[in-house]
Structures are given as structure tokens and as C-alpha cells.
A protein has these predicted regions:
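Short, surface-exposed amphipathic charged segments that create phosphate/polyanion-binding patches used
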Residues: 30, 93-97, 171-172
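Hydrophobic or amphipathic alpha-helical targeting/insertion segments
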Residues: 73-74, 92, 96-97, 101
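A broad, structural surface signal
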Residues: 3, 38-45, 91, 120, ...
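Secondary-structure boundary motif
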Residues: 46-50, 95, 124, 128-131
Length: 176
């Protein structure tokens, strides 16, 4: 969407639309982040051709993430929240942290695909991946990194993550 103020009204114009279909590789459902970035860059080019813009906003599903190595390279395509790898994981976590405590800290609905459960799954099932990772970026921040080369974390999404309390406390996104 390309939005602009005309007088005191906000006008929005769709300039490009693309599907966001996950891909299955070896039985795992992944975000097709490479194709998405291609389409996002295409959208930016189309917006520039229509007169440009002052800012870009990235809005996407908040629970999925990418892991970067020490050189800033994406270690694997982000696993899609619809992948069943976290089935049963919340119950394992609740044995360690009561669900009431998780809800009290985050205020978000306890869904099996939340970031906390995805990270717990990785810690249990793929610990080498987390050990080798240098940084963790949620999807909007990962996309912003691919566009700008800057690694930043959006505090609005901190509530979705372990360590974030929804009150401005920044969770640690470095894995090392």
C-alpha cells in the first residue's frame, strides 16, 4: 500500500499484491522469505515510480523469527507458525513455568505457535542451531534488516517474546 495525506485525509492505494504461500521442505513448513523479499523490493520500486515515499512500515505475523549467524547471514528460512512442530510444546513449558505466570508477564493468548514455544522446541530438539546463532530477529525486524542492513528490535513485539513483559522491557535477542 502506498499511503499519503491529501489535505486532512489519508489516501491509500494498492500498488502491488502478492501471495505469501509457505513452502514445505523435508516435511517442514517454512516462510519463503527470499521470494517475499523479492516482492517487497518490487513493491518499493513501484512506489518509487509513483512519486516515492517518506517511510516504510512492515507489518507481519509476530511470532516467527529468523536466526542470524555471526556474519549476519540467515541460518535457515524461518519456520512457519502453521508448522506442527510445536504441537504439545506448551504443555512441556507449563511444567516449568505455569501458564498463569506466562500470561501475567505477556498478556497474550497462549497459542502453541507463540515464540516462547518455538524457542523451547529449538532448545530441546535443535540445540546446535541455537548455539550457532548469534542473533534472533522477529519477522518484521528480519525484513527490515534485509532492506537496510541494520539489525534492530521493535519493542512493540517484545510482548510476544520470552523476556519481554509488554511494558517496554527489551528481551535479549542475542543468543550467545
Amino acid at each position: 500500500m502506498l499511503s499519503r495525506f491529501e489535505g486532512n485525509q489519508l489516501k491509500a492505494e494498492e500498488i502491488h499484491r502478492f501471495s505469501n504461500d509457505p513452502v514445505v521442505l523435508n516435511g517442514v513448513l517454512y516462510w519463503d522469505i527470499v521470494r517475499m523479499m523479492f516482492e517487497i523490493k518490487r513493491s518499493i520500486s513501484l512506489a518509487l515510480a509513483k512519486g516515492g515515499f517518506d517511510a516504510i512500515g512492515i507489518d507481519t505475523w509476530g511470532v516467527d523469527f529468523g536466526l542470524l549467524d555471526r556474519r549476519g547471514n540467515l541460518m535457515q528460512n524461518p519456520v512457519h507458525y502453521r508448522d506442527p512442530h510445536t504441537v504439545g510444546v506448551p504443555e512441556q513449558v507449563f511444567k516449568i513455568i505455569p501458564k498463569e505466570e506466562i500470561y501475567k508477564k505477556t498478556g497474550i493468548q497462549l497459542m502453541r505457535f507463540n515464540t516462547l514455544y518455538q524457542l523451547y522446541y529449538l532448545a530441546r530438539e535443535e540445540p546446535a542451531l541455537l548455539t550457532q546463532a548469534d542473533q534472533f530477529l522477529l519477522m518484521p525486524d528480519l525484513m527490515a534488516y534485509f532492506l537496510t542492513g541494520e539489525k534492530v528490535q521493535n519493542l512493540e513485539k517484545a510482548v510476544d517474546c520470552p523476556g519481554g513483559d509488554g511494558e517496554g522491557t527489551r528481551p535479549s535477542y542475542h543468543t550467545g
